[in-house]
Amino acid sequence: MTTEGQDDSSKEEFTNRINKQKGRISSEFIEETKYLSQSQKDSWNENGFILIPNFYPKSKCEEINQTVIDIVRSMVDNSEEFNHAYIDDGHIGIREMKPPIKIENIEDEMSKVFRLHQKGIFNEFINREDLLDMLQDILGENIDCFLSQFIFKNPGAWGQPWHQDSSYFPFDRAPQVGAWLATSPATEENGCLVILPGSHKEPLHEHLPDDRPGSNYGYTEIKDHDFS
């Protein structure tokens, strides 16, 4: 489980679709590995994640950040009006429903940009041999990247409540793995991703609409779990 103008009917429709899967196990264990170390395998099976510090060079992370900013600015320049969502050159950009604390540029208002992995440095990252080797240990040899997103986490943005990623992807071809890269310091002050260790062993919980005023469309929340 992780945590980070929409009418009630659209929220209800979205959560009903998610909750049709309730009870499906959110992840699978791995037994034999070729590339992962024993400690990495143990972390995956026990905690549900593997943490690899300094996996990508700082210069490459900075290049990713600047490339995303350039993409967002291009989206807005090519749009005829102020929008909540932008589509340009195959990318989808989503604005925050609740404005961040400080806005100087359009990227300060953004929540996410989707569909980045087919080009440039993003495609370079997902095709790293060491990344693919580790994913192969978990997923098997046939690997496909079906989704990519850049999350801004600007100061004052709501972030997303506790949820299970598997609830958003009702596929019959499990398992699925998220390869998450921090392109800036992942600190509590910066609003880092939070994971509940061991929650991957649980079935999917009921996901309810995020009822905070100004929450983004598609944000759902698990409320039948004690996170204290």
What are these regions (language model features)?
Residues 42, 186-228:
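Double-stranded beta-helix
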Residues 152, 181-182, 195:
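Hydrophobic side chains in beta-strands
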Residues 120-123, 166-169, 181-184, 226-228:
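Short helix-to-loop capping/linker segments positioned immediately adjacent to catalytic or ligand/cofactor-binding
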Residues 2-46, 53-162, 169-171:
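Non-heme Fe(II)-dependent double-stranded beta-helix
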Residues 138, 163, 170-188:
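Short, conserved beta-strand element in jelly-roll/cupin
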